[in-house]
Swiss-Prot record:
Family matches, as InterPro entries: Aldolase_TIM, Indole-3-glycerol_P_synth, Indole-3-glycerol_P_synth_dom, Indole-3-GlycerolPSynthase_CS, RibuloseP-bd_barrel
Alphabetical list of PROSITE patterns matching this protein: IGPS
Protein name per its UniProtKB record: Indole-3-glycerol phosphate synthase
Organism: Cereibacter sphaeroides (strain ATCC 17029 / ATH 2.4.9)
EC nos: 4.1.1.48
Membrane-spanning ranges: none
Length: 270
């Protein structure tokens, strides 16, 4: 029985083949070389985490499990709201079929703010890495559940070639062990199982203590309150990727500011 991730991979491979036929790699590489210099995604998170939390705020219109998340979807306005609200970096969905994302969303977001941007997509081919840089991405995502070890190494090497950082995403102890063979400092612990789309913060609680000390932990998915962040910070997570819970709010700037608040302050304590 195929999983959601299996179905995504199947259409992604078809999409990659179609894009290669439409736009040769040499043209994508020319665009990548002409793109503005990378902004330093990992550096920004590390700096923020040294004195507080590093927040990757996600621009996401829909998801396979929840359907449409936000109808009022003005990408530049959302990007500016996140920046003003205190986000460290942005994550922008560019996958169309499952997330109603688009390449242009990444371009729009990066042009609207000064924050480093992650291209949030399912990457299987180094063509997509060059494409990410051409779109202005400062970081790419490698999902260990969806690639082989050799693919992960190739994608990481391509990102390094283009001066981009890599967020390596894991959901299990086995995936974490595999991720440790990569050079990237950013380890994303996804609290969502990509086969079932079930979410549990216990995933971060279990895996965070197993992450090498020289890596920077980013907890992803299922984060709704300052208490959630404070809880996971006790396990070593100082950076967080948050999308849906912020996207559903009418005032995204205020919601961003609120989730970054100290839990005691948010409750009227000291």
């Amino acid at each position: 029985m195929s999983t959601i991730l299996d179905r995504i991979k199947a259409y992604k491979l078809e999409e990659i083949a179609a894009r290669k036929a439409e736009r040769p790699l040499v043209a994508v590489e020319d665009a990548a070389r002409a793109a503005p210099a990378p902004r330093g995604f990992a550096r920004a998170l590390s700096t923020a985490a040294a004195t507080g939390y590093g927040l990757i705020a996600e621009i996401k219109k829909a998801s396979p499990s929840k359907g449409l998340i936000r109808e009022d979807f003005d990408v530049p306005a959302l990007a500016r709201a996140y920046e003003t609200g205190g986000a460290t970096c942005l994550s922008v969905l560019t996958d169309g079929p499952s997330f109603q994302g688009a390449d242009d969303f990444l371009r729009q977001a990066r042009e609207a703010v000064k924050l480093p941007c992650l291209r949030k997509d399912f990457l299987y081919d180094t063509y997509q890495v060059a494409e990410a840089r051409a779109l202005g991405a400062d970081c790419i995502l490698i999902i260990m559940a969806s690639v082989t070890d050799s693919q992960a190494l190739e994608l990481e090497a391509a990102a390094s070639h283009w001066g981009m950082d890599v967020l390596v995403e894991v959901h299990s102890r086995d995936e974490l062990a595999r991720a440790e063979h990569l050079k990237s400092r950013l380890i994303g612990i996804n609290n969502r199982n990509l086969d079932t789309f079930e979410v549990s913060l216990d995933v971060t609680r279990d895996l965070a203590r197993r992450v090498p000390e020289d890596r920077l932990i980013v907890s992803e998915s299922g984060l709704y309150t300052p208490e959630d962040l404070a809880d996971l910070a006790r396990y070593g997570a100082r950076c967080f990727l948050i999308g849906e819970s912020l996207m559903r709010q009418a005032d995204v700037e205020a919601a961003t500011r609120a989730i970054l608040a100290d839990p005691l302050t948010a409750q009227g304590g000291v």
